[in-house]
A protein has these predicted regions:
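Short, non-transmembrane cytosolic segments of multipass membrane proteins
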Residues: 1-29
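Short amphipathic alpha-helical segments, especially helix-boundary/capping motifs
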Residues: 9-18, 89-91, 150-154
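Phosphate-binding glycine-rich loops and adjacent basic patches that engage nucleotide phosphates
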Residues: 1-4, 93-96, 137-139
């Protein structure tokens, strides 16, 4: 075993986590209170080389994973209560992160497909990736609020009634995205942002029933 490479890997990992911790608050606050900035920031970073992108703020996907997927995974593991050893925890985290990422992907995927369908631009791999990044920034605050109340529900079922607030916030943030990306007026953007809720609304109701039902 090359201990030099091992220590270097540990050093790089510790440094990377420290950077994430430092950049997380300002990235989340910016995306929460300045949604137009997130779209502009992604467009500006898209002009750079891939290795030079998202140096000042967390990348959209990483922000989305930290504030949406990770808290939901933690709340699900805690709710199940089947962790009896460190190995159980590691296994639950591995499986939980994958499943929660797939569940959380439904929201940006629905909006991306809907936006591309309503737009006039040709669908390309590069444009889809940029759109995914924009939606990750736009949806992170709403999914963070949902994750927060999902965790608080573990202590008091009263907080479950705040879960629909995330859908309202989601629509608000998506209005900014539709207005900027499709160059449409507010009323039309609001309509476009609401329509996908016909798909996502039943999913939210199912999740609320999941949290209400006894384990």
């Amino acid at each position: 075993m090359d201990f030099g490479k091992l220590f270097q890997s540990i050093e790089d990992a510790v440094y990377e986590v420290m950077v994430w911790i430092l950049l997380l608050p300002k990235t989340l606050i910016r995306s929460m209170f300045r949604p137009r900035w997130t779209i502009q920031y992604v467009n500006e970073e898209w002009e750079k080389q891939p290795d030079d992108r998202f140096d000042e703020y967390l990348s959209p996907v990483l922000l989305w994973l930290i504030v949406a997927v990770l808290p939901l995974t933690a709340s699900t593991i805690w709710r199940n209560g089947n962790i009896k050893s460190l190995q159980d925890l590691v296994s639950a985290l591995h499986d939980g992160l994958l499943s929660q990422a797939l569940y959380a992907m439904i929201i940006p995927f629905t909006y991306i497909v809907w936006m591309e369908w309503m737009g006039t631009r040709p669908v390309k791999k590069s444009t889809l990736k940029r759109s995914f990044y924009i939606h990750c920034y736009a949806l992170a605050p709403a999914q963070f609020i949902y994750s927060l109340f999902a965790i608080l529900t573990l202590w008091n079922d009263f907080f479950i009634y705040f879960l629909p607030l995330s859908s309202l916030l989601l629509v608000i943030y998506e209005v900014f995205v539709f207005r900027t990306e499709l160059k449409i007026p507010f009323g039309k953007a609001l309509l476009y942002a609401i329509v996908p809720q016909l798909v996502l609304g039943p999913l939210l109701l199912w999740l609320i029933r999941f949290y209400i039902s006894p384990m």
